[in-house]
Amino acid sequence: MDDFKLDKPTPYYLQFYNQLKKMIFNGTFKPGERINETQLAKSFGVSRSPIREAMRLLEKDGLLKADDRNGFSITSLTAKDVDEIYKIRIPLEQLAVELVIDEADEEELTILEKQLEETEKAIHNGTEDTEIIRLNQKFHELLVDFSHNRHLKNLLEHVNDLIHFCRILNYTGDHRAETILREHRRIFEEVKKKNKEAAKQHVLAHFNHDCEHLKHVLEEGKEN
């Protein structure tokens, strides 16, 4: 906590919300770990009130779960969670690629292609996983941005944190970065050709592969 400094103009609970989310995503807190509100308040040197408000927001995002002792623990994804998240995500991102084909201009397509090239370069250079994950996340964000549909973007933002949770787990295993990049390229090639049905099928195949891999990772976690 030593590197965390309060920014007075921003409400404290929002600062703690962002900091705690970062700590969940970087593995400081592990899935299933119980969060001690009093201990966090002491560590940050504040009252419990802004910590409690931050934790309520994280519960709303699906990153924390209330327990039967009036506390919270870090969400542990289940196979059912993965199914439910991707049942939302697949049709929305299929719609996104359709809209990109209709709405995106040449400059935006070039940005998408450069994003894939940057990811490939990072993988080749042995860049750490957190950066590869960020670059691949950016590809999906650009697809949604270039759909030019703010309501679609808002819908995806409601489940964005849980999607990111899945994305971190999805990079467990050998050659996952290369596999995911290859699937992203297939989607982009069909977008460039303006082939809506093929682009949607590649989105479906990509996410089906993700689901299968995530369930395998979760099953292995149970066994270990």
From Swiss-Prot:
The UniProt record lists the keyword Cytoplasm: no
Entries under Gene3D superfamilies matching the protein: GntR ligand-binding domain-like, Winged helix-like DNA-binding domain superfamily/Winged helix DNA-binding domain
PROSITE patterns tied to this protein: HTH_GNTR
Keyword rRNA-binding assigned: no
Entry-linked SMART domains: FCD, HTH_GNTR
Annotated Pfam families: FCD (PF07729), GntR (PF00392)
Location of the HTH gntR-type domain: 10-77
Molecular function GO terms recorded: DNA-binding transcription factor activity; sequence-specific DNA binding
InterPro entries: AsnC-type_HTH_dom, GntR_C, TF_FadR/GntR_C, Tscrpt_reg_HTH_GntR, WH-like_DNA-bd_sf, WH_DNA-bd_sf
Residue ranges of DNA binding: 37-56
Annotated keywords: DNA-binding, Transcription, Transcription regulation
PANTHER family: REGULATORY PROTEIN GNTR HTH (PTHR43537:SF47), TRANSCRIPTIONAL REGULATOR, GNTR FAMILY (PTHR43537)
Protein name: Uncharacterized HTH-type transcriptional regulator YdhC
Organism: Bacillus subtilis (strain 168)
Gene behind this protein: ydhC
